[in-house]
């Protein structure tokens, strides 16, 4: 309920006035030599935020001095901009007034290998120039694609990640949701 109230409060504010700075959840690369992979979700802007989140992935290889943030953004796609955006914002920035929830936080040995697989999944995303709020493809379709392509992430997107099942074949699962086939 608190998230819903915060979303409604943000709904009446001009989007350019909303907080978009760092949330302090990503370790400082200047003092963190180890590799890092993080996945975030934040409520969307306006009334849609009652029902939906925007997700993204941030990676920092060993000894890197900065993060790389991967996400899908719809703004401008209809005018020829790519849907997949790189480094549009910091790794853990607020999403138009909403503090993101960290869904994945991997660090240390073996994470550089995972980062290489994440980058390969980003490059092979099947909808790099497409965006549609519902049913997808959207930011959650992208993040789900990477998660399915890199099972070591152990990514579990929330129910509010609308679009995560955009391409899936319908079928029952033990949890009663949609069948989510692994990436090939």
Where do the model's predicted regions map?
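Non-catalytic ligand/cofactor/substrate-binding and regulatory segments of enzyme domains
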Residues: 4-137, 148-149, 169, 174-184
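Active-site nucleophilic cysteine motif
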Residues: 131-164
């Amino acid at each position: 309920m608190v998230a819903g109230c915060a979303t409604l409060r943000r709904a009446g504010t001009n989007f350019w006035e909303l907080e978009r700075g760092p949330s302090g959840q990503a370790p400082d690369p200047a003092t963190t030599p180890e590799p890092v992979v993080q996945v975030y979700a934040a409520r969307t802007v306006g009334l849609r935020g009652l029902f939906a989140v925007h997700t993204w992935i941030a990676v920092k290889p060993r000894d890197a001095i900065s993060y790389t943030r991967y996400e899908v953004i719809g703004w401008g796609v209809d005018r020829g901009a790519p849907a997949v955006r790189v480094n549009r914002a910091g790794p853990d920035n607020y999403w138009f007034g909403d503090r993101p929830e960290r869904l994945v936080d991997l660090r240390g040995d073996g994470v550089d290998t995972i980062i290489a697989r994440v980058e390969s999944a980003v490059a092979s995303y099947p909808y790099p120039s497409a965006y549609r709020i519902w049913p997808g493809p959207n930011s959650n379709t992208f993040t789900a694609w990477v998660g399915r392509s890199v099972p070591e992430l152990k990514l579990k997107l929330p129910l509010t990640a609308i679009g995560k099942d955009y391409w899936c074949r319908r079928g029952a699962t033990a949890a009663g949701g949609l069948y989510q086939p692994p990436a090939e």
